[in-house]
Amino acid sequence: MEPGTESPTTDRQSQAVDTLSSIAEREGFLATGDPALQGEAADRGHAQLLDYTELYELWERQQWATQDLDFGQDRIDWHQRIGDEERFQRMFGLSAFFIGEQRVTDELGPIMRACPTEEQRIFLSTQIADEARHVRFFNRFYDEVGVLEGTDGLADRLRATEEHLNDAFGELFDGMLHSRVDRLAAEPEDTVAVVEAITLYHMVIEGVLALTGQHFIIGYNEEVGTLPGFVEGFGKVARDEHRHIAFGTRFLTDMAAADERYREAIQRMLAESLPLADKVLDPPWAAADEDWEAFGASKEETHAFAAQCLSRRLKVIGLA
C-alpha cells in the first residue's frame, strides 16, 4: 500500500461513519438515543442514553399509522418500472423483514415479562405494539402493491414469501431466538437468560441485521426513485427500531455495570450469534464464497456498516 493511502477496510469504515451521520439527520432518529448515531462521542464510549421513562415518552411522541400511507405509485413501480430479475432480488430483503417482524412480535412477550423492573416492562409493552404495526405495514404493502399475486391474508402471504429466505435466517430466528425465549418463558426469574435474550434480540437481530437492511433498502429506493409509500413507511419502521435498540443498549449497559456475570452473558451471546447473523445478511441467490451486490451495496460495504453500528453500541456498554 502506498504511503498516505487508506486500506480498503479503513475506507469502508470511513464510509460507514459518514453514512451513520447522514442517518442521524433524518427526522426523529437522533432523538432515539441510539449510540450508533451519536458519532465521535460513541466512538469514545460516551453517549447520551435515554432512561426507560424517557424512551416511553419518546414512543408517545413518535406515533404513526400504517393506514396513512399511499401505495398507489408503489404498485405502478413494482409492476411497470422494476424488472423481473430485480423484483426477484428485492424479495430477499422484503421477505426477511416481513417474516422477521412477525417472528420478533411473537417472541417479545416472555422477554418483556421477565425484565426486572416495571419501567422496563412498560417500555417493552410499547415495543410489542410497534412490532405488530410493522407486520401490518408489510402485509398492507404486499396486499395493495400485489407483491405476491394470488395470496389471501396475512398467514398466506407469510408462507408464500418464506421461500425467498436463506437457511441461516431460519437457524437464527426459529432456532436460536425461539429456544432462548422458550427457556425464558419457563424460567422468567433467570436474569442471565434475560440478558442473553436482549443481547440476541436488540443488539444482533435489530442492531446488526434490521438496521443494516433498512438503511440500504431505503437508500437504494430513494436513489432510483421507486416505492415512495414504502420508503415513507419503512423509514418510520427504522426510527422505531433505533428506539428499541436504544432500550437494549441502556438495559445492557446497566446490567454489565451491575454484575460481571451479565457482562459475560453478553459476550457469550455475541460470540454464539454473530457468525450466524453474518450469514443471514447474504442473499440466498449469491454463492457463499463470492462478493455480491444488493440494494446498491456490496457484501463488504454491507458487513462493514453492520460492524460499525455494533462497535459503537458495544463501546458504550463497555465491551469494546
Located regions from the model:
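Non-heme di-metal
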Residues: 2-320
